[in-house]
């Protein structure tokens, strides 16, 4: 790591992550390289190595930032509401997920590569952000569904978070994929991120009432 203030180091890392995010809007994960990232920053590829050893570490930092932003929304739901019905709680969580399409894309398509090819200390930092999202959803359930037991909450978590892996591929379908589904005679109803997430949340909340 080059010498400099913590603020300067953080700013440089942020610039690199922002460049990666910009490329990810139009390029696939496999096509994005440190060289390509360097083209949209003030850094050379060699300079980037001062902050990240692999492109996967840059993506992991982007992934962590997505969880941080989702956590802010979850905390705001917790702090800005005193009482929420099941429908209201499901709606607010679904909206927060709808805002994090990039998180869902990384989760479903690139999670393994990012974790495998990143240094342990960076993976630990990411896991803290991920762990905070688990904690925040638990806090929401404890506040707005006080009837749910610890086991109920645990069941909810271990269904909903794995479910999140499938949201992006089920809602971000290309024209080519749609044409193939139609040609194959597959009867499929396309849903938005919000619709799919809301339906799952409502089902889980209702199950816990039985």
Identify the residue ranges that each predicted region occupies.
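Basic, helix-initiating cap at the start of DNA-binding domains
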Residues: 1-27, 36, 40, 81
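Alpha-helical structural segments
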Residues: 11, 15-22, 40, 57-77, ...
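Helix-turn-helix
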Residues: 30-57, 61
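Hydrophobic alpha-helical connector segments
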Residues: 61, 75-103, 156-160
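Amphipathic alpha-helical segments used for helix-helix packing
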Residues: 100-121, 175-179
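A contiguous binding-surface segment within folded domains or other stable secondary-structure elements
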Residues: 111-142
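C-terminal peripheral helix-coil segments that are non-catalytic and often amphipathic
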Residues: 135-147, 163-210
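Membrane-interface starts of transmembrane alpha-helices
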Residues: 145, 149-157
């Amino acid at each position: 790591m080059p010498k400099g203030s913590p603020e300067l180091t953080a700013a440089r890392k942020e610039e690199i992550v922002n460049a990666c995010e910009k490329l990810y809007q139009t390029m696939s994960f496999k096509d994005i390289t440190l060289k390509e990232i360097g083209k949209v920053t003030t850094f050379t590829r060699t300079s980037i190595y001062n902050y990240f050893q692999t492109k996967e570490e840059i993506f992991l930092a982007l992934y962590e930032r997505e969880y941080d932003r989702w956590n802010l929304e979850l905390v705001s739901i917790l702090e800005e509401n005193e009482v929420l019905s099941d429908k209201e709680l499901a709606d607010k969580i679904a909206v927060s997920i709808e805002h994090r399409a990039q998180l869902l894309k990384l989760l479903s398509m690139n999670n393994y590569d990012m974790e495998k090819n990143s240094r342990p200390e960076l993976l630990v930092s990411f896991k803290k952000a991920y762990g905070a999202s688990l904690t925040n959803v638990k806090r929401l359930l404890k506040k707005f569904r006080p009837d749910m037991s610890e086991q109920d909450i645990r069941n909810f978590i271990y269904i909903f978070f794995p479910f999140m892996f499938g949201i992006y591929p089920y809602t971000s379908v290309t024209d080519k994929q749609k044409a193939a589904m139609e040609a194959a005679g597959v009867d499929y109803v396309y849903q938005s991120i919000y619709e799919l997430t809301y339906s799952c949340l409502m089902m889980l909340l209702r199950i816990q009432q039985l």
